[in-house]
Amino acid sequence: MHNTVFRYELNAMTRRTFGFDFENWMQNGFRAEEYIPYSFEEKGRIVANVSVNWMFFNKNGEEQLCFQLGTVMEDKAYRSRGLIWQLMERILERYDGIETGIYLFGNLGALDFYRKLGFRELMQYEYTLKPGVIKREGRHFRPVKKDALALR
């Protein structure tokens, strides 16, 4: 997300869709290399996006590289054109064969869509740390919404 114009457009669409953006996150030194947006744009405006966010998890005492599919959004005027499906297929093809975990937190209305792509529901756990435990260097925890559902 080093392209300032693209970052501005991605943040604008994220604000319209979810009511937040990533600018503070970027300005506070969190690494953009781990956040990879896949987008369709028209006339310089992002109209659909799915992002890959790389992170490490501790699974049974072993560190495992995983990626989260997030910031899944589509401009209302572009819905029902298959843009998100195309982006998801492109991402899954791109990382096919890489030994990693893939997960997302899908909204309940999109579960059938994700199932068609091969995702399945799994048990979800939530862990928290007291403020000040995490330093800016190294790997970071990401917030998890309580009503989210993990798939694939």
Residue ranges of each PLM-predicted region?
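Conserved acetyl-CoA-binding loop-helix of GNAT-fold acetyltransferases
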Residues: 74, 79-93
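Conserved catalytic-core motifs of GNAT/GCN5-like acyltransferases
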Residues: 120-137
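Short amphipathic alpha-helix that is part of the acyltransferase structural core
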Residues: 1-48, 68, 135-152
